[in-house]
């Protein structure tokens, strides 16, 4: 089981100094990865979780963390693909992979906020087809000597994008989603799946089976998939990843029996850490305490 940690990207604790300190501390304690997420825009009257009201750009945050670390992987869960062109994202993520020495993982989602669709001029229609074409464009840009794509939603004239990502074959792509079709699609076309912040982890085994079934139906090896769980800690009323340190470790071990290959602890959804009115020093102190007590070297 690989263990990661969410960067401070939401709320008052999302400052340059704290991003750097959390990134460095996670690497020193042998965490496997650092993660960010995307929230572009919140409508003035939109009813959303307060942690969404101030969020750093996910790729900029990862680039900042990359400059302060050497080994730890850098993931985003997720970039909402309707809001950006695949060619533009391929260039951004490929460049980050080069500059970080081949450490990037790209999670992709299809978005849910109507305000963000309006703000970006994006369409929320045909999400399945859009996802398939988007992934295909990324891969031809990262893999082929001459890239080209002629789809219903995206077109790429013959050409080249350089430099290519440092990782052979391109940056690993993880798809989000929680409905059966999206889960199967992750197994069919992606390198793995990443769960969302509100996912019911008590049923994750059933979701993993759908991801694996998608891979099998596509003639792919389901054992080669990465199954990444966003571990929101201490969720009020939650059954998983709450309680004592020992209980949280037991929960992580149980997730492994359900087919999860990676868990990252994400504190950005804890209102006592990432809320808009939280004292940032207290938030960082609490986060470092969690990072220390859940040190992956203590997970059997």
Task: Describe the function of each predicted region.
Residues 27-28, 32, 125-167, 195-300:
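An alpha-helical appendage that flanks or caps ligand/catalytic pockets
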Residues 9-11, 40-41, 80, 110-114, ...:
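Active-site-proximal loop/turn and secondary-structure-junction residues that shape catalytic pockets
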Residues 42-49, 76, 82-189, 205-223:
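Internal, glycine-rich beta/alpha segment that forms the wall or movable "lid"
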Residues 5-17, 77-87, 167-178, 232-246:
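Active-site mouth loops of central-metabolism enzymes
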Residues 1-68, 171, 268, 277-293:
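N-terminal beta1-alpha1-beta2 module of alpha/beta enzyme domains
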Residues 3-7, 34-36, 73-77, 104-108, ...:
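Hydrophobic faces of well-ordered beta-strands that scaffold small-molecule active sites
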Residues 30, 68-71, 100, 187-193, ...:
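Glycine-enriched alpha-helix->loop->beta-strand junction motifs that scaffold or abut catalytic
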Residues 14-26, 88-93, 175-185, 241-255:
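Short, acidic/polar
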């Amino acid at each position: 089981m690989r263990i990661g940690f969410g960067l401070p990207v939401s709320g008052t604790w999302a400052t340059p100094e704290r991003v750097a300190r959390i990134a460095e501390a996670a690497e020193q304690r042998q965490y496997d990865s650092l993660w960010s997420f995307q929230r572009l825009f919140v409508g003035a009257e939109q009813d959303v979780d307060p942690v969404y009201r101030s969020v750093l750009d996910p790729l900029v945050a990862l680039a900042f963390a990359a400059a302060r670390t050497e080994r730890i992987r850098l993931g985003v869960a997720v970039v909402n693909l309707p809001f950006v062109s695949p060619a533009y994202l391929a260039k951004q993520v490929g460049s980050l992979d080069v500059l970080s020495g081949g450490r990037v993982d790209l999670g992709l989602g299809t978005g849910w906020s109507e305000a963000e669709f309006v703000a970006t001029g994006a369409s929320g229609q045909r999400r399945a087809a859009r996802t398939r074409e988007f992934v295909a464009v990324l891969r031809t840009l990262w893999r082929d000597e001459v890239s080209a794509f002629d789809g219903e939603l995206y077109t790429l004239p013959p050409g080249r994008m350089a430099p290519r990502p440092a990782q052979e074959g391109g940056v690993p792509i993880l798809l989000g989603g929680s409905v059966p079709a999206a889960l199967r699609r992750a197994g069919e076309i992606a390198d793995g799946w990443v769960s969302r912040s509100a996912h019911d982890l008590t049923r994750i085994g059933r979701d993993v089976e759908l991801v694996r079934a998608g891979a099998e139906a596509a003639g792919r090896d389901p054992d080669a998939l990465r199954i990444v769980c966003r571990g929101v800690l201490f969720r009020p009323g939650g059954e998983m990843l709450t309680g004592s340190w020992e209980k949280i470790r037991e929960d992580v071990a149980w997730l492994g029996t359900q087919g999860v290959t990676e868990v990252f602890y994400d504190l950005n959804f804890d209102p006592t850490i990432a809320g808009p009115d939280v004292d940032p020093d207290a938030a960082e102190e609490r986060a470092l305490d969690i990072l220390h007590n859940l040190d992956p070297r203590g997970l059997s």
